[in-house]
C-alpha cells in the first residue's frame, strides 16, 4: 500500500511538472539571415582559411588546429556570426543537402551577396552534396571559400586539403543552386 501511494505521488508530481502540450515551445520566427550576418560568416571562413584548417569528413571542431568538412565550415561560421545576436541556426548540425532542402531560401546567381550559400555537386548529377560560401562574381567567375580534400593531379596525393579560397567559371556544372541561410529568433 505504501509503495502504491509513493508511486502515485511520484507520478502526480511528474505529470504536474511536465508540459501538458498546451504550450507550443517550438514557436519561433524564421527569416533569411540578414546580410551583415552572412558577411560576418564569410569573415570567419577567412579566419579558418588563414589558420590552415584541414579537411575532415564529418568535422565540425570549434577549436584551432582543427579539421572540418564543407557543411561543418558553414555551420561553424554562421554560429560564430550569430554570437551576440538574437538569431540562431534552425538546426545545429546539417549536411549540405539538408541546408539546401530545409535551411535556405533559394536565390538566383544575380542575387548572390557575400556569405551566401553555394550548393554544389558532381558535374554529372543534380544532387547537392557540397556547400561553399560565396564571396563574389567577377569576370564570369564565382569566388568562394570551402573545405575540401581533392587530388586534382590524379597522382593519389591530395593537393587540396582543407579550407580553401577558389573560383570556378559561373557556368560550371558543379554549381547546383544558390541560397541564403535561414535563421530563427
Language model features: what each stretch is:
Residues 93-103:
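Short, structured beta-strand/loop micro-motifs enriched in basic residues and often containing a Trp
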Residues 21-89:
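N-terminal capping segments
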Amino acid at each position: 500500500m505504501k509503495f502504491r501511494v509513493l508511486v502515485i505521488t511520484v507520478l502526480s508530481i511528474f505529470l504536474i511538472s511536465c508540459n501538458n502540450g498546451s504550450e507550443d515551445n517550438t514557436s519561433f520566427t524564421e527569416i533569411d539571415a540578414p546580410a551583415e550576418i552572412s558577411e560576418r560568416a564569410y569573415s570567419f571562413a577567412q579566419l579558418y582559411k588563414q589558420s590552415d584548417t584541414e579537411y575532415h569528413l564529418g568535422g565540425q571542431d570549434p577549436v584551432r588546429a582543427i579539421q572540418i568538412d564543407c557543411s561543418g565550415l558553414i555551420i561553424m561560421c554562421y554560429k560564430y556570426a550569430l554570437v551576440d545576436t538574437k538569431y540562431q541556426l534552425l538546426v545545429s548540425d546539417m549536411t549540405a543537402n539538408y541546408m539546401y532542402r530545409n535551411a535556405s531560401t533559394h536565390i538566383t546567381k544575380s542575387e548572390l551577396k557575400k556569405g551566401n550559400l553555394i550548393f554544389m555537386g558532381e558535374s554529372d548529377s543534380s544532387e547537392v552534396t557540397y556547400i561553399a560560401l560565396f564571396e563574389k562574381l567577377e569576370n564570369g567567375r564565382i569566388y568562394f571559400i570551402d573545405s575540401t580534400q581533392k587530388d586534382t593531379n590524379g597522382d593519389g596525393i591530395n593537393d587540396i586539403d582543407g579550407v580553401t579560397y577558389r573560383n570556378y567559371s559561373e557556368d560550371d556544372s558543379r554549381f547546383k543552386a544558390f541560397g541564403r541561410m535561414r535563421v530563427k529568433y
